[in-house]
Amino acid sequence: MCAIAYLGGLLTGIVIAIIASIIASVISYRKGIEFRKKKAEAKIGSAEQEAERIISEAQKIAEAKKREVLLEAKEEIHKSRLELDREIKERRNEIQRLERRLVQKEEALDRKVESLEQKEELLNKKTKEIQELYEQTLETQRQQVAELERISGLSVDEAKEVLLKNVENEVKHEMAILIKDIEAKAKEEAEIRAKNIIAMAIQKCAADHVSEVTVSVVPLPNDEMKGRIIGREGRNIRTLETLTGIDLIIDDTPEAVILSGFDPIRREIARITLEKLILDGRIHPARIEEMVEKARKEVENTIRQEGENATFETGVHGLHPEIVRLLGKLKFRTSYGQNVLSHSIEVARLAGLMAAELGVDVNLAKRAGLLHDIGKAVDHEVEGSHVTIGADIAKKYKESNEVVNAIASHHGDVEATSIIAVLVQAADSISAARPGARRETLESYIKRLEKLEEIANSFDGVDKCFAIQAGREIRIMVKPEDVSDSDIALIARDIVKRIENELDYPGQIKVNVIRETRYIEYAK
């Protein structure tokens, strides 16, 4: 019982303690809430005071700023007012100055008007006097004309006609003299200008010249090789001659074989073939055929390369490949001993240099000059002259009309229609006529000189004649008692016509007719 009572008392104490603890916690919580409330109220009050202070300071700053802005605005307005007053003052001064000038001009204008009125009055007076004098002059003139008509027996119209005829004849005579002087001066200046242009072009053009012949010589390592070239019963040499179209001359010339033929391309093929056969050592018909074919291909490559080199050397581009190949073939063509490709390159350079001096298209002049003899590449294969063939080739491969005309007219067969064609004619003549450019056989050269002198001697009144300058000039002495000064021009013209009709010659021939009269007296 005691234990139970003890436990009951213990539980009661615990319950009381718990209740007391709860009550204490509630009281403490309420006090905490009240404390925080008071603290918050205190903070709110402090914040309100701070806000009021900040607002007050802001109002003070705003007032100060307002006063400052107002002050600056007043100063700016004051400055603007001063500036405006200054400008107004300047404008007023300017207006006053202009008004003064206007007044001065008005005064000057008034003075001028007054002066003009005085001059007009004086002019009217002078005009009246002049009119009176004019009427008096007309009356005097009528009287003089009537007197002249009475004395001369001619009317006014008849006198005018006579006077006009005299004046017309005099003016015509003076015009003829003036025109003759102008023409002579123009010809002289043109000749000087042309000579300067040609001289400059020739000085700038230094083309190499190689004369070709109709034979080629192939060296042999020894004379035993001649027998191998001939072959058994001559079959090797016959095969070689048949395939190349070239004659092989094997004679007593030591260690050499001569190739003879007028076609340089065939001769070159034969030369290359023979050199390859000699180097190879195997000489028989089958091997000859093989080597001839290789030589043809090699020559064809050489032709194309020579054509390309010519275009590169002259600076002419854009040519059709077939035209380039035909240019290369000119390397193996000659005219009077002058290599045609070298001649064409020289003509292109000369034409280009003269075109540059005259201010015309240099590239077009070079192109026309390079192609002017293109017909000679195939004139032995196609019917017609090289001029006609060349023009047809140029048309076929779409060359310009200027180039076609330059090719067609460079020998005078067709009229030149452009300055380019004229330049090509001149360049062609210069290249062909320069000393050493062309040659001919001794026999034909001597015959040409003899024929030249024979033509000159066939004319009446010719005393003697001499072909000089390698046949490029003939000097004719006439008998002064049989030929007058006026006959000299006729004789020279007739000789020129005979030469042009009866002789073939490169370039041009100068005909120089001389009439010399001597008077001899003796002082005693």
Swiss-Prot record:
Stored PROSITE patterns: HD, KH_TYPE_1
GO molecular function: RNA binding; RNA endonuclease activity
Transmembrane segments: 7-27
InterPro entries: HD/PDEase_dom, HD_domain, HDIG_dom, KH_dom, KH_dom_type_1, KH_dom_type_1_sf, Ribonuclease_Y, RNase_Y_N
Sorted UniProt keywords: Cell membrane, Endonuclease, Hydrolase, Membrane, Nuclease, RNA-binding, Transmembrane, Transmembrane helix
Locations listed in the record: Cell membrane
GO CC annotation: plasma membrane
Superkingdom of this protein's organism: Bacteria
SUPFAM superfamilies (alphabetical): Eukaryotic type KH-domain (KH-domain type I), HD-domain/PDEase-like
Membrane topology of this protein: Single-pass membrane protein
UniProt xrefs under Pfam families: HD (PF01966), KH_1 (PF00013), RNase_Y_N (PF12072)
Major subcellular site: membrane
The EC number(s) this enzyme carries: 3.1.-.-
Domain KH: 214-299
GO terms for biological process, alphabetical: mRNA catabolic process
Residue ranges constituting the HD domain according to the UniProt record: 340-433
HAMAP family linked: RNase_Y
PANTHER family linked to this entry: RIBONUCLEASE Y
Protein purpose: Endoribonuclease that initiates mRNA decay.
Protein family membership: Belongs to the RNase Y family.
Protein name: Ribonuclease Y
Organism: Acetivibrio thermocellus (strain ATCC 27405 / DSM 1237 / JCM 9322 / NBRC 103400 / NCIMB 10682 / NRRL B-4536 / VPI 7372)
